């Protein structure tokens, strides 16, 4: 019986060990078989070319990721979505993308709704937003806007920005007739006077330049309330399976960040983004006139950035934009995030 028991035990250990080895093989194979990196970006362009602004346009124009992974035969696929954050979250849920450059609310909604994403890098901070109104409307403050028709792109960073701006003035969305329009539709509706106002980014300055809108309020006027943070997030499955690839991607991104955070490159940056996005250069020049690129585009997930991002999570929860609040520090990918660069 002893011999039989020992033999059975030996076979059991051998079978278990073999199962462990075989079970690990798919994981090892997967880790070694990265053929393509799929990156999602909200498309901010008004023309036929794609633009994500910020670090994305620098990365693509210089083919930084493509060059970084060329020696491994890994292709980089950029996917631009006009539907912005909500559509990108769907792509994450369907396993169609590995990374995404997103504004704060879209990334927060995805995480809160159960998407397994990891926070890898800051990509912008303190980005201004504007209130655009019909010329001659007499609207000078957010208080003046009560009861009016305001276009906001729901599910995007602009919605959270709007809510934060309102909260700073003791207001909420309930005080207005909020209409969900994407950025292009909102600009068209405001120009046609089909709405009273729109909350959005520098694209509203194009209407101002044409005399089709006034911009009485910006987040700068509100002491920064409503300014936007942007991030790079990665699929949890990809990050866990390919930490070396993620590490290499973040280090390659720093090449773009180092160029972008040099204030002397502001004119070149304006020219780059304007060309890709089909915006008149004066729009971005006006938007960035009093701004320092060195303050907008650092990639570190420092305590100040994480604190503001946590504030965004808390506000989104208070405004019932998300169901489950969470700790931003638990979202950060350990040992890989830009905090360690």
Language-model-detected regions and their locations in the chain:
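Secondary-structure end/capping motifs
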Residues: 45-50, 240-321
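A local structural motif
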Residues: 33-36, 68-81, 96-98, 168-180, ...
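Pocket-lining segment of extracytoplasmic ligand-binding domains
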Residues: 105, 179, 185-276
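A bilobed periplasmic-binding-protein/Venus flytrap-type ligand-binding module shared by bacterial periplasmic
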Residues: 41-43, 129-139, 228-244
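Short helix-initiation/N-cap motifs at beta->coil->alpha
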Residues: 78-90, 103, 176-191
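Short, polar/charged alpha-helical segment
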Residues: 36, 46-76, 112-113, 308-311
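Conserved C-terminal helix/tail region of periplasmic/extracytoplasmic solute-binding proteins
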Residues: 310-341
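Immediate post-signal peptide segment of exported/extracytoplasmic ligand-binding proteins
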Residues: 27-49, 69-74, 137-149, 317, ...
């Amino acid at each position: 019986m002893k011999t039989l028991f020992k033999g059975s035990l030996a076979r059991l250990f051998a079978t278990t060990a073999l199962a462990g080895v075989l079970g690990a093989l798919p994981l090892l194979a997967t880790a070694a078989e990265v053929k393509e990196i799929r990156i999602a970006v909200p498309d901010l362009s008004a023309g036929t070319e794609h633009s994500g602004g910020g670090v994305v346009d620098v990365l693509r124009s210089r083919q930084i990721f493509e060059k970084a992974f060329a020696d491994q035969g890994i292709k980089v696929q950029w996917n631009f979505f006009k539907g912005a954050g909500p559509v990108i979250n769907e792509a994450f849920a369907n396993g169609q993308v590995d990374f995404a450059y997103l504004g704060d609310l879209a990334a927060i909604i995805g995480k809160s709704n159960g998407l397994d994403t990891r926070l890898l890098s800051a990509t912008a901070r303190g980005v201004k937003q504007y209130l655009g109104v019909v010329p001659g409307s007499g609207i000078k403050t957010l208080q003046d806007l009560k009861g009016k028709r305001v276009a906001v792109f729901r599910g995007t960073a602009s919605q959270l920005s709007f809510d934060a701006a309102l909260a700073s003035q003791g207001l909420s969305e309930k005080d207005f007739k909020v209409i969900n329009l994407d950025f292009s539709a909102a600009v068209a509706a405001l120009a046609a006077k089909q709405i009273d106002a729109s909350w959005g980014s520098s694209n509203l300055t194009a209407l101002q330049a044409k005399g089709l809108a006034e911009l009485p309020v910006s987040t700068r006027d509100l002491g920064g309330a409503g300014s936007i943070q942007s991030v790079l997030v990665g699929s949890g499955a990809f990050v866990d399976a390919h930490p070396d690839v993620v590490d290499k991607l973040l280090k390659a991104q720093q090449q773009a960040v180092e160029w972008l955070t040099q204030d002397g490159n502001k004119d070149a940056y304006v020219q780059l983004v304007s060309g890709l996005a089909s915006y008149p250069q004066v729009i971005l020049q006006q938007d960035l006139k009093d701004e320092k690129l060195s303050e907008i585009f650092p990639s570190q997930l420092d305590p100040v950035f994480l604190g503001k991002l946590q504030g965004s999570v808390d506000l989104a929860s208070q405004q019932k934009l998300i169901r489950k609040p969470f700790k931003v520090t638990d979202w950060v990918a350990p040992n890989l995030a830009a905090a360690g660069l």
